[in-house]
Each structure stands twice: as C-alpha cells, then as structure tokens.
Amino acid sequence: MKWSQVLEDPALQNLPYKIELNEWGNIVLSPASNKHGLLQAEISWFLRQNKKNGKALTECSINTSKGVKVADAAWGADDFFNRNYLETPYQEAPDLCIEIISPSNAAQEIEEKINLYLSQGAREVWVCDEEGFIKFYTSQGEIEASQLFPNAPKKIEY
C-alpha cells in the first residue's frame, strides 16, 4: 500500500490510532492515549513559541527506508518548507523530529525511528517518555541538551 492510498481510503479516516506503513507497505497501528495527545500539544506549543524562522507540525509523515513513519511532532526551518511545503509524505525529514513513547512502543522500535529520522536528514530527534522527560539525539548519539532549541526543557509539565 502507498501513503496516498492510506490518505484517500475513507475506512482509514478518523481512527483512534496513528497509522504508519512498514517497509512492505503494510499498515501499522499505534493507539495513543490522552496523555500522549497532551504531551504532543505542549511540545508543539513550545516549538511555536521558541523558534520564529520555521514551523512546527504534528503527525508529520516521513518516507524512510522502512516505510512511512509519522513523527508525533516536528519542526522544520523555513528552508525545509521552501523545499518541501506540504508534500505528503515528506521525502526528507524536518530539522527536528519528536517521538512520544506510548506503552505499545518497544525500545528497539524507538531506536530504529531515531536512526530513520536522522538518516532522512533530521538534525535532531527528541524522545519524550510518558512522564514528560525528554532525551535529545543527533547523528553523534544522545546529547545533554538540544542544539536547535537550547532552552528546551528536559521535562514537559502537563
């Protein structure tokens, strides 16, 4: 299945799950809790308030070598949007991709997503756990603080 088919299929609209495609085009569903949604909203608000030369977005679809993955939140510089605008899915990752861990996520799955986003051009990946604690990653591995958002909190209060 292709991402455009997922978007056009009426049976796949308004599901209470996040949809991604694996490398074989199979649909992968991930249920999200209200806590997940609240963390997503708080992070997106922080991104909008703290960087003026780009845009924040949620549910950001990115084509990767392992299928279409959907970052819970993302931020792209103006240059990213000048190149890609609203292409769906993006063929390159925005500057920052953020995953919010759900109980159904395995550690290996999150590690794979970090690597996939970075290999598609993300400069940073943030991983937020269910309690709001954030870890920051670049292609060099885990870093102490965000380089893109130096004032990023290490914990999202909700």
Give the location of each predicted region.
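Gly/Pro/Ser/Thr-rich low-complexity, intrinsically disordered segments predominantly at protein N-termini
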Residues: M1-Y158
